[in-house]
């Protein structure tokens, strides 16, 4: 079982949530809509692992204690998928961002003369400003995974 009877506790952090099917959809979408050098980012929901742990406990009917272990040395507090510099040139394609290849030259004098203040007014796309899954949404996402469905004998 994913939550074994002997497991004493779950340790948690924050992360984006993406199923294998979502990853395949992203690759197919990029092939169909991309140009050479483009970067595609799915607008994936995020969740704290407290939400994940709670959803797993509810699905499995277990009362496994959860221990919040905090940030490890060198670990970021959130995950950035698109920087504000990339967001300044990104194309919003509904469920994805398309970031075209940055083909500017390295003429820095041009930047200082023609620089843009727009970048300083744009926010990164990261795990703290995307949709956060609640426990019910997380359970629905988990139930899309064959490993969970098989483990719960739902297939």
Give the role of each language-model region.
Residues 33-98, 105, 140-144, 149-154:
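Mid/C-terminal beta-alpha module of Rossmann-like enzyme folds, strongest
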């Amino acid at each position: 079982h994913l939550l074994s009877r002997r497991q004493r506790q779950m340790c948690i952090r924050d992360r984006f949530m993406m199923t294998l099917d979502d990853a395949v959809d992203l690759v197919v979408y990029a092939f169909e809509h991309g140009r050479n050098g483009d970067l595609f980012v799915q607008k994936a929901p995020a969740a704290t692992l407290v939400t994940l742990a709670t959803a797993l406990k509810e699905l499995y009917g277990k009362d496994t204690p959860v221990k919040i272990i905090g940030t490890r040395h060198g670990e970021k507090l959130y995950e950035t998928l698109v920087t504000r510099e990339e967001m300044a040139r990104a194309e919003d394609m509904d469920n994805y961002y398309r970031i075209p290849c940055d083909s500017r030259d390295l003429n820095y004098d041009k930047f200082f003369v023609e620089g843009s203040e727009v970048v300083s007014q744009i926010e990164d796309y990261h795990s703290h400003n995307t949709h956060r899954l609640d426990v019910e949404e997380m359970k629905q996402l988990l139930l899309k995974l064959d490993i969970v469905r098989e483990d719960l004998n739902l297939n």
